[in-house]
């Protein structure tokens, strides 16, 4: 591969001189930084100085890598944006949440682009991993990079997109054994990006034909799962009214070879319950109002209330007083084996139970808030 694109510092054949930066050290960014640090020099940047302090102390608040991995990692953790100037290859992995009205909140990715732009040098490549709707990288991020750096994209620096596929709490599917989608603004950039990720992704890379294709691929991955879970949730509501056990139905139907195995559940977190809104937002901007995607979202968003109402019905059937009933909820985070509480649907259950005069007791041993060097529980 030619080293002309990003200069000798980023030549893949000379790993000793390679410097890569990771902007955003959360559930997605941290595992990526640690993985690359085993191959090249890595600058791990995050605005949260307290989080950086934890990492430097060998504490992993995300629980994605583990304290021992953090302690032994060679990542250069920093909250000083000037350190980004040491790198020629930059990966941006910041959150992309939604606003209260379910419109995309691009503030984190715009902020990361602003910081990176201020410290971008000629010959660099910037790769975005944050989940966005098609067009964000080229139409929103690139102009910010150009404005802040005074450089010209395509001449002074290049961009690409490689959607994150980290599944928080999943110790089986890791960055090394999940096929990585990569894309670049041109063939030369795509080749460099592919070679860089191949350093850590043993499963290989898939070269998308364009940045927009890669962006679209990511946003439909989570949308597809959201829709399928919504279908299962709707079935569970129907079968519950019929007095039929949903799990038994799914077990029977699952004996057919082409029956997709999904299950009812609460859809929370920062991905599956959020990403569909990015796609429908862009669709509406183009004059198309989503039918299936938004229907699935409504079903999943209402499941917390449905669970609470069912609990109250069971209390009544058991002839237990509803008001001030002793109710325990085991688990508070948005999914099992993950300390992340963002968009957890347990909050919806609690709010609904309070409407009935019930103040539930919540227990979750994985739920930790690292607001200081000493973790405290979610209470």
Feature locations, PLM:
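Single conserved hydrophobic/aromatic residue that forms the stacking wall/gate
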Residues: 1-12, 370-379
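A short, aliphatic-rich alpha-helical micro-motif
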Residues: 5, 70, 81-87, 120, ...
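NAD(P)+-binding Rossmann beta1-loop-alpha1 motif at the extreme N-terminus of oxidoreductases
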Residues: 13-57, 328-356
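N-terminal glycine-rich dinucleotide-binding loop that anchors FAD/FMN and/or NAD(P) in oxidoreductases
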Residues: 60-75
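Short acidic low-complexity segments
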Residues: 73-87, 372, 376-379
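Rossmann-like NAD(P)(H) cofactor-binding subdomain of soluble oxidoreductases
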Residues: 82, 98-165
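Internal alpha-helical scaffold of NAD(P)-dependent oxidoreductase catalytic cores
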Residues: 143-162, 166-258, 282-286
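Interdomain hinge/lid region at the active-site interface
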Residues: 212-215, 223-321, 325
């Amino acid at each position: 591969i030619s080293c002309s694109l990003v200069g000798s510092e980023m030549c893949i054949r000379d790993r000793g001189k390679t410097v890569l930066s990771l902007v955003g050290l959360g559930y997605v960014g941290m595992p990526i930084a640690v993985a690359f640090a085993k191959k090249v020099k890595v600058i791990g940047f995050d605005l949260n100085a307290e989080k950086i302090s934890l990492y430097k102390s060998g504490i992993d608040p995300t629980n994605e890598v583990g304290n021992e991995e953090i302690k032994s990692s060679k990542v250069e953790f920093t909250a000083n944006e000037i350190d980004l100037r040491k790198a020629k290859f930059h990966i941006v992995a910041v959150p992309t949440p939604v606003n209260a009205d379910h419109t995309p909140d691009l503030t984190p990715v715009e902020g990361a682009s602003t910081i990176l732009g201020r410290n971008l040098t000629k010959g660099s490549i910037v790769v975005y991993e944050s989940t966005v709707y098609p067009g964000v990288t080229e139409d929103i991020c690139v102009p910010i990079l150009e404005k802040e750096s005074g450089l010209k994209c395509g001449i002074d620096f290049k961009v690409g997109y490689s959607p994150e596929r980290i599944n928080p709490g999943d110790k089986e599917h890791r960055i090394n054994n999940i096929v990585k989608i990569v894309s670049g603004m041109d063939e030369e950039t795509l080749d460099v990006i592919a070679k860089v990720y191949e350093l850590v992704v043993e499963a290989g890379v898939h070269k998308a034909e364009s940045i927009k294709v890669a962006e679209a691929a990511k946003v439909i991955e989570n949308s597809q799962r959201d829709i399928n879970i919504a279908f299962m949730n709707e079935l569970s509501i129907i079968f519950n009214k019929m007095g039929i056990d949903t799990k038994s139905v799914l077990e029977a139907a699952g004996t057919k070879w082409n029956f997709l195995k999904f299950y009812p559940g609460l859809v929370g977190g920062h991905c599956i319950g959020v990403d569909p809104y990015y796609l429908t937002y862009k669709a509406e901007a183009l004059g198309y109002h989503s039918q299936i995607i938004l229907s699935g979202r409504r079903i999943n968003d209402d499941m917390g209330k449905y669970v609470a109402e069912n609990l109250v019905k069971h209390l009544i059937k058991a002839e237990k007083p509803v008001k001030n009933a002793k109710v325990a909820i085991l688990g508070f985070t948005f999914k099992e084996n993950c300390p992340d509480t963002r968009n957890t649907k347990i909050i919806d259950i609690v709010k609904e139970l309070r409407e009935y005069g019930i103040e539930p007791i919540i227990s979750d041993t994985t739920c930790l808030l690292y607001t200081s060097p000493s973790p405290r529980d979610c209470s």
